[in-house]
């Protein structure tokens, strides 16, 4: 099984239970969750200063889109992937080529998307 020892992750997810499940999956994959953020304003701030190898972004944070965070991460050359329960068709043109995890997902799906994201 592929794992990602020492990979530092920023998790942006507004549903507490889902965030905890994702954190567990990331830990099983030997990643370190450096920050877990639920609100867009805080995520925007954290994205500008956090030292991570990868970010996982829930597309919809309590009715607000996470795309400002994605723009900051892209400008900082930090790879990211989106997670959503709405499908990838709602992504703006600028992010259509980004990896997307469709909720609900299994650990094997997360492993595959992390590998894909880190390779790109």
Question: Each predicted region: which residue ranges?
Answer:
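Non-catalytic signal-transmission and effector/linker regions of two-component phosphorelay proteins
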Residues: 1-8, 42, 106-120
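A Lys-centered signature of the CheY-like receiver
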Residues: 103
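The feature encodes the CheY-like receiver
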Residues: 62
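Two-component/phosphorelay signaling modules centered on CheY-like receiver
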Residues: 16-35
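Acidic, metal-coordinating helix/loop segments flanking the phosphotransfer/catalytic sites
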Residues: 36-54
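Hydrophobic/aromatic residues positioned on beta-strands within the core alpha/beta folds
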Residues: 81-83
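Active-site residues of response regulator receiver
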Residues: 58
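Conserved acidic carboxylate
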Residues: 13
